[in-house]
From Swiss-Prot:
Annotated function: Probably involved in thiamine biosynthesis.
Protein name from the UniProt record: Putative thiamine biosynthesis protein HI_0357
Superkingdom to which the source organism belongs: Bacteria
Keyword Oxidoreductase (UniProt): no
Source species: Haemophilus influenzae (strain ATCC 51907 / DSM 11121 / KW20 / Rd)
Gene3D superfamilies documented for this protein: Periplasmic binding protein-like II
Entry keywords, A to Z: Thiamine biosynthesis
One GO-annotated biological process of the protein: thiamine biosynthetic process
CDD domains: PBP2_ThiY
Family of the protein in this entry: Belongs to the NMT1/THI5 family.
Length: 314
């Protein structure tokens, strides 16, 4: 009888401890549809790195790319993928957001021209048409780049091409585009049998920055859960760097019919070097320099203290 009682006591004790092993649920909304920029997130999901860190992650693709930070601010999702330059503007507008991690720790934005155009330097853009998608930051980016070689935005004709960056170049609608991601648009042009040339903002006076970051509501960010998410991302990134081919297979397995494309295959190789090896790491100096740049360009009223918009979670 004592043996039976001890057995049931053991079983009951085990059952009482089970809830502690329940996975933490966390939701993340991407900035756009799934692509190689999200490699670390998707591979962490497909290879079980989230699961190993006791997380059940819901990955959401937005219907509108403007939604993710707004939904994170409203606590409708736990995390959102956003852009470092936009974070300053969002916080200035009153959104209670804070950067908690990085996905892409290098600028991807660039000015792209076709090689056949014979535009061999930024100086050659004088009097030419430059296409853009998003006014504001891209205007400031281009103006700074042009200032570094003695020109300004007044020396070019800016044309809003919406999101048709590569098509506008290929059709001759514009001579150059700003806002082209160096890991995508150059490959998109190559698939059309055209060679592109890219000019990188960080080489023409623009402070280096993180292209893609993770943001959360500053008043409700759960350090433990977010920390586990960042640990899984770091593990996935290490796996990506060590096993790029296997990681590619894991990536496309998420949505085989949509992700296994020639463009994604090319972009994959060009994206891996830009992945944040230490997603939680915060470079305070770089973030403050970009804040000052945004203020100088009139994109935000003032450069806030770092603690107002970015944290490094242990």
């Amino acid at each position: 009888m004592k043996t039976i009682i001890r057995y049931f006591s053991f079983v009951m004790g085990l059952m009482l401890t089970l809830p502690s092993f329940a996975k933490e649920k966390i939701s993340i909304m991407l900035d756009w549809y799934v692509n190689p920029d999200h490699a670390a997130i998707i591979v962490a999901q497909q290879k079980g790195f989230f699961e190993k860190n006791n997380l059940e992650v819901e990955i959401i693709e937005p219907a509108d790319p403007a939604l993710p930070p707004k939904l994170a601010a409203a606590e409708k999702v736990d995390l959102a993928v956003s852009y470092q330059p936009q974070l300053y503007q969002q916080v200035a507008e009153g959104l209670p957001l804070v950067r908690v991690g990085s996905l892409i720790s290098n600028p991807l934005n660039s000015v792209v021209v076709l090689k056949k155009s014979n535009l061999k330097s930024l100086a050659d853009l004088k009097g030419k048409k430059v296409g853009y998608s998003v006014s504001g930051f891209e205007d400031g980016l281009l103006d700074t780049m042009l200032h570094s070689i003695g020109l300004s935005n007044k020396d070019v004709e800016l044309v809003n091409v919406n999101w048709s960056l590569s098509p506008s170049l290929l059709t001759g609608q514009v001579d150059a585009v700003i806002g082209a991601f160096r890991n995508f648009e150059l490959n998109q042009l190559a698939l059309e049998k055209q060679e592109g040339i890219a000019f990188f903002p960080e080489q023409y006076g623009v402070p280096a920055y993180d292209e893609l970051i993770l943001v959360a509501n500053k008043n409700s960010v759960t350090d433990k859960k977010t920390s586990a998410f960042l640990t899984a991302l770091e593990q996935a990134t290490s796996y990506l760097q060590a096993h790029p081919n296997e990681a590619w297979q894991a990536f496309v397995s998420y949505k085989p019919n949509e992700l296994n494309t020639p463009l994604n295959q090319l972009a994959w190789k060009d994206t891996l070097p830009f992945l944040a090896n230490k997603p939680r790491q915060l470079d305070a100096k770089r973030y403050q320099q970009m804040a000052e740049f945004m203020q100088q360009k009139g994109l935000i009223p003032k450069a806030l203290a770092l603690k107002e918009y970015a944290v490094e979670i242990e």
